[in-house]
Amino acid sequence: MDLENVSCPICLRKFDNLQALNAHLDVEHGFNDNEDSLGSNDSRLVNGKQKKARSVDSSAQKLKRSHWEKFKKGKSCCHTCGRTLNNNIGAINCRKCGKLYCRRHLPNMIKLNLSAQYDPRNGKWYNCCHDCFVTKPGYNDYGEVIDLTPEFFKVRNIKREDKNLRLLQLENRFVRLVDGLITLYNTYSRSIIHNLKMNSEMSKLERTVTPWRDDRSVLFCNICSEPFGLLLRKHHCRLCGMVVCDDANRNCSNEISIGYLMSAASDLPFEYNIQKDDLLHIPISIRLCSHCIDMLFIGRKFNKDVRMPLSGIFAKYDSMQNISKVIDSLLPIFEDSLNSLKVETAKDSENTLDPKNLNDLARLRHKLLNSFNLYNTLTRQLLSVEPQSHLERQLQNSIKIASAAYINEKILPLKSLPAILNPEGHKTNEDGQKAEPEVKKLSQLMIENLTIKEVKELREELMVLKEQSYLIESTIQDYKKQRRLEEIVTLNKNLEELHSRIHTVQSKLGDHGFN
């Protein structure tokens, strides 16, 4: 018998001799955990010689192993990754909880006493799993916390104050410049000779509003950094005095009519009123750099856009979104109730159904169909709005496709609705009072003719389906002109589903349908 190359029968690890194997079984797999085996000093015969079994220490110094999970070849799995444990990936017990893990998922070390309990002061370091590591006392319980919020507030307030001061400075310069230019225009615009003097006075006023930077030392535009030359002239911003270029492609500076500037900043305290004094078409322009334009007018434009009412397209789309939220909230409730009803009828089809549940489901279905009809009406109204730009036309097409896909997706679950969800109306008894609704069996309800309520709801559904079919067909025609073939394939599939559903509804209606 070869006693030199032996393998562990549990984890298949190879050892040079039996002594190493016995020590491995005692330490790693807990075969020497009993008191008898821990205190035994029986000798073993190895290669014809007596040798004492190797032990980690005396029995009083060994870690508790009775709680360790026993290894079963081909059955034991790692509690973290779930892989079957073998010699390649290892089979190691967590010293704390005793569960088996592979070598990869037992990387942590904790201090334990001989009873396998947490002992950070007097314990020794042992391998443990991630769960035992993170659940030890004191793990991530506390730490140094430095609240930097006041510092961030301070920095933000400084930057905000600087920006507000800069904006206030530009606004004061702008008001002073506009009022001065209008005053000069009203004074000198009556004769040609006075016009020559007016230009000189305006130039002096512009230089007094803000100091201009010496353009002789400036070789590059302060915004786009392009070098000045014969084709790229130097200009001064009338509010900040910075030297910029006049390239139309880069928009570093622009000459803007004073009337449009006043209308864009109508909240400023100008001396003149643009409407009363008829200043909208006054022939005076002011050159401003892009930085000053952004600081003065972007915030005002944003606030103005927020206060403005939504355009026709966006108003209709907002209403469509509100209806879709109602549909999304009602549809799961309806489907859950319908599924529970199907489960009840599947158990025993001869049982009578609760009339209260039937009425609730019929009411939910009626709400859903009305919501779909309203959603479809809003879609038609949105498409009838004349777009004001190419962007709005693109938005209309996108909304048309999205609404068709939405209704096609949401309304199809209603096609499986059985006739039991439309109970007959309450009947009156002989005394003239309303009696309880008649409860029928499922087999009886499925073979009867359609009621007036069913015909009405099927007609509403058919109307919605035909409208969606028309929308998709028109979209397909538009996409054929634009050669968007990939999207046409998807739309054709949706159209086939709609036609199939339309045919089903029409077959149910029969003579009660309409063309």
Curated annotation (Swiss-Prot):
Region (Disordered): 36-58
Main location: membrane
Annotated residues for binding of Zn(2+) 2: C94, C97, C129, C132
One GO MF term attached to the UniProt entry: phosphatidylinositol-3-phosphate binding
Binding site for Zn(2+) 1: C78, C81, C102, H105
Residues engaged in binding Zn(2+) 3: C221, C224, C245, C252
Name this polypeptide is given: Vacuolar segregation protein PEP7
Superkingdom, taxonomy of origin: Eukaryota
Residue intervals of every C2H2-type zinc finger in the record: 6-29
One GO term of the biological process aspect: Golgi to endosome transport
Assembly notes: Interacts with VPS21, VPS45, PEP3 and PEP5.
Miscellaneous remark of the record: Present with 768 molecules/cell in log phase SD medium.
UniProt-annotated location(s): Vacuole membrane
Topology of the protein relative to the lipid bilayer: Peripheral membrane protein
